[in-house]
Amino acid sequence: MCLGRESYGRTYAVVELSHLQDNIREVKSHLRKGMQFCAVVKMDAYGHGIVEVARAVEEECALFGVATIEEGIILRKGGITTPILILGVVPKGQYRSLWHYDIMPSLFTKEQGVALSAIAKKEGKSLACHLALDTGMGRIGIQVEHEGAVDLGLELFSLPGIEIAGIFSHFSSCDDKDKTYTEMQERRFASYLQTLEERGIKLPLCHISNSAGILEGRGVQYDMVRDGIALYGLYPSKDMERRVPLKMALSWKAKISHIKEIPAGEAISYGASFVSKEAMRVATVPVGYGDGYPRVLSNKAKVLVGGNPCPILGRVCMDQFMIDVSQVEAEVFQEVTLLGKEGEEEISLYDWEEWGVFPYEFLCNLGNRVPRVYKMKGKWVGTYDPLSSLHSEEYQEEES
């Protein structure tokens, strides 16, 4: 179902799908020819909408990375046919769904392998998996430095009905300026792969480079890279050199719900943390931390009204916050920009990061009361309303 902007009188986020495509092409232009690309779309594509994002970038991808089997199933039900890899752990009770929906799990224990092999025999069909290695992230995977790590890998390769289609690991600190730990992970990964080869294993698809690795040129000598946060237009760390130009895909809008005049000495919001020093014109924005707007931005951040920065007054409430519009023209129902560009001004997640907002966390926490409205090169093409489960059956053009 495609809905116009008028359907959202309170707030909505805009996702420019062409920016996702541009980011992939920009990243690929810095990689060697033939490098395969995995788009990481876990956590509802970092809050952007998993099905809509996957549809927009599928032609550029060899693989989609998700965190849970439920996310993989959502993609399959959304018509995605590209291979899917679960980067996390699949509960044993959901193993059979891997066959039903043609989804690959991460494999790293004998118990997993034996159980999956037994199901493969019953199903009469092998299951493709990726071998997960822990080279220093400390999360999941075969601990490559432990005694027996290679033997475990060989055993998993030998299980009937199990096809090891890939081997991967994950950088933990590649966005740090000091690359000592990353270099150690690179050595461990390369050493494990070399040992497998020496023991007679023909290596499948190998990948270790994440967004930070891609942007820093680390781990890009292998067969594939996995792009997460950079796909959506952000660098993993504000301290990284901006070698690759990226476009932020998501912006956030709201409409003023109320405007009032207040005298000097008037308190605003909970705790009276802001008290006016003079007469002011104050507008209410009907968005709060219940929608994912960070409370830590109270009395700090600004929004754009007519392209003009207007500061937040007092604490951000669950559903509303107030701004100073004394110096700008503003009216009820006027659209304001909470995040993104308006005219020559921009509110960015890097600005918020200065006040303790972690960009990844914000995107993942953008609430389900905030509809996502999709554009393709500036044209409105679809809407996803999490509360109403309104997934677009197909993108439809609508003049903006």
Model-derived segments and their meaning:
Residues C2-Q21, D44, E71, V90, ...:
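Active-site anion/phosphate-binding pocket segments in diverse small-molecule metabolic enzymes
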Residues C2-S7, T11-V15, H19-D22, R32-H207:
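Active-site-proximal beta-alpha core segment in soluble small-molecule metabolic enzymes
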